[in-house]
């Protein structure tokens, strides 16, 4: 059961078409690395979506069945291989062929059977030329049927997935839904966004909970369409990177995404992008009034307690945009979100920059690195039973 995992190297190396040819030769499902959804055409029958944090459950289920994985142009970073949806999907007994330009990355995070230091495009072409005429014929139709069934089941599930689960012993998400019944959840917002994005759009994603929840939603037909901070993980990346994308591709619609915490780090550029010589963009700001990733860690490991994660609910980024001479819009429903996004992309053609403030409830997605932390255990405390009388000696 061959599986291809396509990474950033496929995009950077211009290897997407070669990856497609290789996948079609083998009828192999193609998973994308975390936030590299543009590394394989999303409409292709063999595309099964991104692995990693809040990725495609179909991709996870299919790669778990692999007996050989071609990791093409990827360093196999932890966000692309960590368990998701309760599935520890990495195929530990499969033969792993890792292709990366940097030899230091080969075998760094996962045990590999064959390591190839090289360009993804050239290596894909060479592998394809070396394959036998009947390569991939074993169980070919069975494999194609399984890919279709698994992918269809996941897309149906994703289209109706509205809310985030709580961990045992915590109730934050349940209370968030109850507290703000009239507000969209992050997943509802992402479905609305998906419905409003132009086909040829370039997007950027900041680091953070609400942006990462959207990992499974965007699909692309071409490369260099999805800008993401990667493992460096800097808050404040989404806004300046989408400005750069528009400067580089002035005739292409662009949309940046950021949570309200991360956006605050780079919001000073709102005054810069209002200048006439700057191209117009759309910037979406998820407004849930909290540092979500930090809060999810806190409530998970400290029994629904948190500190230092709250943001000012009185601040309006839409009003700040208006004050800077830009267009600021606040949306509260899925329909408003879709319509505002469509309008903003049309407005880009007229030289109008739009900041869309999306009001959400306070549901929180999975912790980014559940594997990296453990619930704290009290090793010492203050208890009268542990104390002994202090004897004062005279003199």
Label the model's feature ranges.
Residues 152-249:
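Active-site diphosphate/adenylate-binding microenvironment
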Residues 36-155, 341-345:
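Glycine-rich, acidic loop regions that bind phosphate or pyrophosphate groups
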Residues 63-65, 107-109, 115-117, 121-125, ...:
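Thiamine diphosphate
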Residues 1-66, 196-240:
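Anionic-ligand anchoring segments at beta-strand to alpha-helix junctions in alpha/beta enzyme folds, i.e.
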Residues 21-26, 81-101, 223-224, 369-383:
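A short, gly/pro- and small-residue-rich
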Residues 8-10, 35-37, 74-77, 208-210, ...:
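Short glycine-rich anion-binding loops that position phosphate/pyrophosphate groups of nucleotides
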Residues 28-34, 97-100, 283-286:
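Short internal beta-strands
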């Amino acid at each position: 059961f061959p599986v291809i995992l396509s990474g950033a190297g496929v995009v950077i190396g211009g290897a997407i078409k070669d990856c497609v040819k290789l996948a079609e030769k083998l009828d192999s499902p193609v998973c994308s690395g975390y936030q590299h959804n543009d590394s394989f055409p999303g409409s292709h029958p063999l595309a099964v979506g991104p692995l990693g944090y809040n990725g495609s459950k179909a991709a996870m289920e299919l790669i778990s069945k692999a007996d050989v994985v071609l990791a093409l142009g990827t360093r196999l970073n932890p966000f692309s291989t960590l368990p998701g949806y309760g599935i520890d999907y990495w195929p530990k007994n499969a033969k792993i062929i890792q292709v990366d330009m940097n030899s230091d990355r080969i075998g760094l995070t996962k045990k590999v059977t064959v390591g190839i230091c090289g360009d993804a495009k050239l290596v894909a072409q060479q592998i394809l030329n070396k394959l036998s005429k009947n390569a991939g014929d074993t169980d070919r139709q069975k494999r194609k049927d399984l890919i279709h069934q698994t992918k269809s089941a996941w897309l149906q599930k994703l289209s109706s997935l509205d809310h985030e689960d709580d961990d045992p012993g915590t109730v934050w998400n349940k209370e968030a839904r109850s507290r703000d019944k009239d507000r969209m959840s992050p997943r509802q917002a992402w479905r609305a966004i998906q419905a409003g994005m132009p086909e040829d759009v370039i997007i950027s994603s900041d680091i953070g909970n609400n942006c990462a929840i959207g990992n499974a939603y965007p699909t692309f037909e071409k490369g260099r369409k999805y800008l993401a901070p990667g493992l460096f993980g800097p808050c404040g990346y989404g806004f300046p990177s989408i400005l750069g994308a528009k400067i580089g591709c002035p005739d292409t619609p662009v949309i940046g995404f950021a949570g309200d915490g991360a956006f605050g780090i780079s919001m000073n550029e709102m005054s810069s992008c209002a200048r006439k010589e700057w191209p117009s963009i759309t910037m979406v700001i998820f407004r849930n009034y909290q540092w979500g990733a930090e809060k999810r860690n806190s409530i998970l490991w400290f029994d629904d307690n948190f500190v230092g994660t709250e943001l000012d609910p009185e601040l309006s980024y839409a009003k700040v945009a208006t004050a800077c001479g830009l267009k600021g819009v606040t949306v509260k429903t899925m329909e408003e979100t879709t319509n505002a996004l469509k309008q903003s992309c049309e407005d880009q053609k007229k030289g109008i920059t739009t900041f869309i403030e999306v009001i959400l409830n306070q549901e929180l997605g999975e912790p980014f690195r559940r594997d990296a932390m453990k619930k704290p255990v009290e090793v010492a405390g203050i208890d009268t039973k542990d104390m002994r009388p202090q004897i004062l000696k005279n003199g």
